[in-house]
Regions:
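Small-residue-rich segments of transmembrane alpha-helices in multi-pass membrane proteins
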Residues: 96, 171-180
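Alpha-helical transmembrane segments and their membrane-interface exit regions
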Residues: 145-150, 172, 200-207
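Generic recognition of stable, solvent-exposed alpha-helical segments in well-folded globular domains
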Residues: 11, 23, 27, 69, ...
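Transmembrane alpha-helical segments of polytopic membrane transport and secretion proteins
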Residues: 1-3
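Aromatic-rich transmembrane-lumenal/periplasmic boundary elements in polytopic membrane proteins
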Residues: 185, 192-223
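Short alpha-helical linear motifs
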Residues: 111-117, 186-188, 201-202
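Hydrophobic alpha-helical membrane-associated segments
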Residues: 152, 179-191
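Early transmembrane hairpin of solute transport permeases
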Residues: 5-168
Length: 223
């Protein structure tokens, strides 16, 4: 593998560490709050139970929105300059993708009946931030984060003169990103269900293949 490819993979790995490092803290707080609200240990409706429910509700926002956290974290980490702009563009791009994908599923007649994430579990679609979208999970955040960072690094220094001056730099990056994100939202409606089926099939093979499954997992992990 070329050194350039190795450097790119190392940069991506480091970018992943930002959001990942917050997860143990969120998980620990969620575990503590679950114990505090366990009716086998405390009285339901009491102060401790109420506090546990309150903490659990707040911390669950971290666990339940990993996609957007990875999107912002990866884009900010991979940006070579003006990282705050990259983070903001990542957030906007994520919201645009959600809205565009939800609308495309609707107009294309691909929306599966269900009003909650639990009702849509296993269908390949979910409810994310109020939008009925293709369920890409954390992969959406990873992919969008990388795309935003690449476009940001390529066009962040673009400037114009005269009346167009206000549309340079991060604003021009958004202009470039918008059609890319819209196309990605449409393509995901058709491509991701197939990719997800492949991932599930591979998981099933590794789980049922015994020693070979362990070898395959180790091999892919090393690759």
């Amino acid at each position: 593998m070329k050194q350039k490819d190795m450097d790119a993979m190392q940069s991506f790995s480091k970018a992943l560490m930002g959001p990942v490092l917050f997860l143990p803290i969120a998980g620990m707080l969620q575990a503590i709050s679950s114990v505090m609200s366990n009716t086998a240990l405390v009285t339901e409706g009491g102060v401790v139970w109420t506090l546990g429910k309150f903490i659990n509700g707040g911390v669950s926002a971290v666990i339940g929105n990993l996609g957007i956290l990875f999107c912002v974290g990866i884009a900010m980490s991979l940006a070579k300059k003006r990282k705050a702009d990259a983070a903001f563009l990542a957030l906007v791009s994520y919201l645009v993708w959600l809205a565009a994908n939800a609308r495309w599923l609707d107009v294309a007649g691909l929306t599966i009946a269900g009003d909650t994430a639990s009702a849509l579990y296993g269908t390949g679609q979910t409810i994310c931030l109020g939008y009925h979208v293709t369920d890409m999970g954390v992969f959406l955040g990873m992919i969008l984060g990388v795309v935003v960072a690449l476009v940001h690094n390529r066009f962040i220094d673009t400037e114009f003169e005269g009346a167009m001056a206000m549309y340079g730099n991060s604003k021009f990056v958004f202009v470039v990103l918008l059609p890319i994100v819209l196309v990605m939202a449409v393509v995901a409606s058709y491509v991701w269900p197939v990719a997800a089926a492949g991932i599930n099939a591979l998981t099933g093979v590794m789980a049922s293949a015994g020693a070979f499954g362990v070898f395959l997992y180790g091999f892919l992990n090393r690759v």
